[in-house]
A protein has these predicted regions:
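Membrane-embedded transmembrane alpha-helical bundles that form the catalytic cores
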Residues: 1-187
Length: 187
């Protein structure tokens, strides 16, 4: 039987975010560990304190196969960006203003590939630092779960582009301001 003062650590990420931690975990030392955890501090995804503390309390088992698969995803993203930089000169075209005189279709393609370049430029560091956290046994939320061209709406784009920050804002700003009950304050 579990002690009423010590809640069980949930395995589900949504539960780990929502469930409060024991009062003694909301200390200055725990806050510093959370704030200065290197994989997430440098350039990793944003993680809620409750999720982080729950995983420190009861470390998750992350199968080596899942970590290896994620490592392959990081490598594929890196090589895809290298391929794009080597064969598609959209960044050079933009910087040198070589797009002057292009047809509207060509301008559209240059713009689209510039967006894809920005996506790669951001997804690679986020995935590398999340991989570092996974190797350390911390399952941080995945950012950019969709490609930029696979967002059906602005809301879908926001929820998937910087997903971990969206979850943090919902947990620490939107819900305390009243959530859907008080949309004027939550704007």
């Amino acid at each position: 039987a579990t002690d009423e003062k010590t809640p069980r650590t949930p395995k589900n990420a949504k539960e780990r975010v929502r469930q409060s931690r024991p009062a003694n975990e909301y200390s200055f030392v725990h806050s510093l560990v959370y704030l200065w955890y290197p994989p997430l501090f440098i350039a990793g995804p944003v993680m809620t304190f409750n999720d982080f503390a729950a995983q420190l309390d009861v470390p998750l088992y992350i199968p080596p196969r899942a970590i290896a698969g994620y490592m392959v995803r990081c490598i594929i993203a890196l090589f895809s960006m290298e391929f794009m930089l080597h064969y598609m000169y959209v960044n050079a075209i933009k910087s040198a203003r070589a797009w002057e005189g292009c047809t509207p279709m060509e301008l559209g393609m240059i713009g689209l590939f510039n967006l894809e370049f920005v996506w790669f430029k951001l997804v690679i560091p986020w995935r590398v630092f999340r991989l570092w956290a996974l190797l350390d046994g911390v399952d941080a939320p995945e950012n950019m779960i969709r490609a930029i061209t696979n967002s059906p709406s602005a809301l879908g784009f926001w929820r998937s582009w910087h997903r971990s920050y969206n979850q943090w804002v919902v947990r620490y700003v939107y819900i305390p301001l009243g959530g859907s009950r008080n949309q004027l304050l939550a704007m």
